[in-house]
């Protein structure tokens, strides 16, 4: 399985269960269906709706991912840092430049239609899945004036070091104008 499939398995199992419990405990009267109706533009709403309508991740599939696949990802990621004697990875935070919410949907990446949700989370998934610290920092504004970001990932347990690296980056990054936000 690729990292997107594993990420979706873990996320969707945990989100459907955890978010439902959280919303019920909050007592604010907002249910998962209400929330889904409000986040459809991101692509996440449609995916959550599918899960609620019977495509939920089974306990067996989740257990396999968390006990077998996740440790393999953790080991692979640890090897990258150790074998290359590096403290952090630096990468574009997303596969796509940011879009206005009204323009979200799907894009073609490497000849394959991909939801904006997957494209925007693809690069940050290895650390998230493996339990490594990850940091996303504004890098610049795109030609359309929207903020673009870079990501930093560190080895498990390097949270403070990674924050120090991010803070050092922000000190040397050119000052960025604030994006113009439409009301």
Spans of features found by a protein language model:
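Conserved acidic residues
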Residues: 87
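Small-aliphatic-rich amphipathic alpha-helix that forms the alpha element of a beta-alpha
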Residues: 76-79, 114-138
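Flexible loop/turn segments at secondary-structure boundaries
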Residues: 1-2, 97-100, 143-144, 160
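Active-site charged/polar residues at nucleotide-handling catalytic sites that mediate phosphoryl
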Residues: 84
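Short helix-loop capping/hinge segments that flank enzyme active sites or metal/cofactor-binding pockets
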Residues: 12-75, 92, 96, 136-146
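Structural helix-boundary/capping segments
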Residues: 128-183
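Acidic helix-start/capping segments at beta-turn-to-alpha-helix junctions
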Residues: 1-9
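Short, surface-exposed loop/helix-turn segments at secondary-structure junctions
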Residues: 7, 99-120
């Amino acid at each position: 399985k690729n990292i997107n499939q594993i990420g979706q398995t873990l996320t969707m199992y945990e989100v459907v269960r955890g978010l439902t419990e959280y919303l019920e405990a909050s007592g604010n009267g907002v249910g998962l269906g209400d929330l889904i109706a409000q986040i459809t533009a991101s692509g996440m709403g449609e995916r959550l709706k599918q899960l609620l309508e019977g495509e939920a991740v089974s306990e067996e599939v989740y257990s396999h991912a968390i006990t077998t696949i996740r440790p393999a990802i953790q080991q692979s990621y640890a090897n990258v840092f150790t074998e290359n004697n590096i403290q952090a990875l630096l990468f574009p935070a997303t596969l796509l430049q940011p879009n206005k919410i009204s323009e979200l949907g799907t894009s073609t990446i490497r000849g394959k239609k991909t939801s904006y949700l997957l494209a925007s989370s693809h690069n940050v998934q290895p650390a998230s899945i493996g339990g490594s610290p990850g940091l996303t920092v504004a890098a610049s504004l795109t030609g359309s004036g929207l903020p673009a970001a870079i990501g930093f990932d560190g080895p498990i347990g390097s949270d403070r070091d990674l924050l120090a690296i991010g803070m050092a980056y922000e000190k040397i990054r050119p000052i960025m104008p604030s994006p113009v936000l439409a009301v």
